A protein has these predicted regions:
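N-terminal leader/linker segments that initiate helical-solenoid repeat arrays
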Residues: 2-74
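Hydrophobic face of amphipathic alpha-helices that form TPR/SEL1-like repeat modules
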Residues: 82-89, 117-124, 152-160, 189-196, ...
């Protein structure tokens, strides 16, 4: 990872990316999402969920399963994704609609979590045979609709050359979009780009602290740990006593 971290540090040194925290909003169904010109690739009926890190779906709240199903039947994309998540988590479907059918309906309406999940399933199913164009399209669409993890996934794919041709410029472009969409993990990647071991790039502990702080405010506990390390080792500027007290309070127990 050294080379890309060096590139991040060199390109972002002295620049600040505005922090725009991400919140997935409940939305009314949107028109069916346009498909790429390539042939459509649909997930199989019973994919293997074991190696797929699915995003957390919104909870039912005070609604019953029957109420959520009624909303899904009426075209509510979020409810459709909630049913997918419910049945994919091991609950037996009490109708003839499998989990994947609800996922497909939600994705076709442009629901960001459904687009992201569908893309991950397609990538997992293809393995080392390359990434379906629809999966890339779905990740881009999910990111455009505010789900920052989709941009981060695209960053990793193009950085690692996993199923696509590795491209540093493309990877960094998606990383920047993830930051702009409020991804704490993306800010943390940039923070590490200013630390030793970044492949020969500039070392700037204050810049590392700045980006780690943005990541921490977006919920990254790894960023909190990095901040504490920088302060304990007197690597960053500031009143370390007060800052350490504050950030140690932000560190949640791991158990």
């Amino acid at each position: 990872m050294g080379n890309i971290l060096s590139s991040i540090a060199q390109r972002l040194l002295g620049r600040k990316v505005e922090c725009q925290p991400h919140r997935t909003q409940r939305r009314t169904p949107s028109p069916t999402i346009a498909q790429p010109s390539c042939s459509t690739v649909r997930p199989q009926a019973s994919p293997n969920w074991t190696h797929i890190d699915l995003p957390q779906a919104p909870t039912f709240g005070m609604r019953s399963l029957a109420e959520v199903r009624a909303e899904a039947e009426n075209g509510d994309a979020e409810a459709q994704y909630q049913l997918f998540d419910y049945y994919a988590s091991g609950h037996k479907a009490d109708d003839d609609r499998p989990a994947m059918e609800w996922l497909t309906k939600a994705a076709e309406q442009g629901y960001p979590l459904a687009l992201y999940t569908s893309a991950l399933i397609q990538i997992e199913e293809k393995g080392d045979k390359g990434i379906p164009p629809q999966a890339i399209f779905y990740l881009q669409a999910s990111g455009e609709r505010g789900f920052s993890d989709a941009y981060l996934q695209l960053y990793h794919l193009y950085y690692e050359g996993k199923g696509v041709e590795a491209n540093e410029d493309t990877a960094l472009g998606y990383l920047r979009q993830a930051m702009e969409a409020g991804s704490g993990a993306a800010y943390l990647i940039v923070a590490k780009g200013f630390l030793p071991g970044n492949g020969g790039g500039p070392i700037d502990y204050d810049a590392a602290y700045y980006y780690a702080e943005q990541a921490a405010h977006l919920g990254s506990q790894q960023a909190v740990e990095l901040i504490i390390h920088l302060l304990e080792e007197n690597l960053a500027s500031g009143d370390h006593t007060e800052l350490l007290t504050y950030w140690r309070r932000q560190l949640r127990p791991s158990h």
